[in-house]
UniProtKB/Swiss-Prot annotation:
Source organism phylogeny: Bacteria, Pseudomonadati, Pseudomonadota, Gammaproteobacteria, Enterobacterales
NCBIfam families from the UniProt entry: rpsE_bact
Gene source species: Blochmanniella floridana
Pfam families documented for this protein: Ribosomal_S5, Ribosomal_S5_C
Nucleus keyword on record: no
Entry keyword set: Ribonucleoprotein, Ribosomal protein, RNA-binding, rRNA-binding
InterPro entries for this protein: Ribosomal_Su5_D2-typ_SF (IPR020568), Ribosomal_uS5 (IPR000851), Ribosomal_uS5_bac-type (IPR005712), Ribosomal_uS5_C (IPR005324), Ribosomal_uS5_N (IPR013810), Ribosomal_uS5_N_CS (IPR018192), Ribsml_uS5_D2-typ_fold_subgr (IPR014721)
Protein name as catalogued: Small ribosomal subunit protein uS5
Any one Gene Ontology cellular component term annotated for this protein: small ribosomal subunit
HAMAP family in the record: Ribosomal_uS5_B
Family in the record: Belongs to the universal ribosomal protein uS5 family.
Length: 177
């Protein structure tokens, strides 16, 4: 099962999405033992996102474990006022490579599967994205999160370089700003 509809948690005002549920088996002396693995993403639609991978004998337990792990592994993403990326970014995790670039207002989220779920819960509305290599949902999620972690806002760049924000904005292009 891949990419189910969103569920909203009223406890923390977080948006939760289930990406995949896999049935896995372990062969033992008496036959096979089945268990389930769930991959989920959680975000506040305002620049915070986390993902979790949970395993259990029953599907609801696996999903619950994944959601708990996702809530504990949340990171902050610097968003543009136009709800898009600050700049083009590349994310790599094992065999999965993803490329994301900012899009103009009204474009929407042009991305597939697991990447789309992350971008929706983080609060990005306009982005163009492409996955290369491995399309394994776990690798795509990790590559996307790695890319989002490495994104820098103009304020962060100015502070790191010891320059003024005006200097950075005038001499470098940050999504048309």
């Amino acid at each position: 099962m891949r990419y189910s509809n969103k569920q909203t948690s009223n406890i923390h005002e977080l948006q939760e999405k289930l990406i995949t549920v896999n049935r896995v088996s372990k062969t033992v002396k008496g036959g096979r033992v089945f268990s389930f693995a769930a991959l989920t993403v959680v975000g506040n639609v305002n620049g915070r996102v986390g993902f979790g991978y949970g395993k259990a004998r029953e599907v609801p337990s696996a999903i619950q474990k994944a959601m708990e792990k996702a809530r504990h592994n949340m990171i902050d993403i610097p968003l543009n006022p136009g709800r898009t990326l600050q700049h083009s970014i590349i994310g790599i995790y094992t065999g999965a490579r993803i490329y994301m670039k900012p899009a103009s207002e009204g474009t929407g989220i042009i991305a597939g599967g697991a990447m789309r779920a992350i971008l929706e819960v983080v609060g990005i509305h306009n982005v163009l994205a492409k996955a290369y290599g491995s399309t394994n949902p776990i690798n795509i999620v990790r590559a996307t999160v790695n890319a989002l972690k490495n994104m820098k806002s103009p304020e962060m760049v100015a502070e790191k370089r010891g320059k003024s924000l005006e200097y950075i904005l005038n001499n470098y292009t940050y999504n048309g700003r």
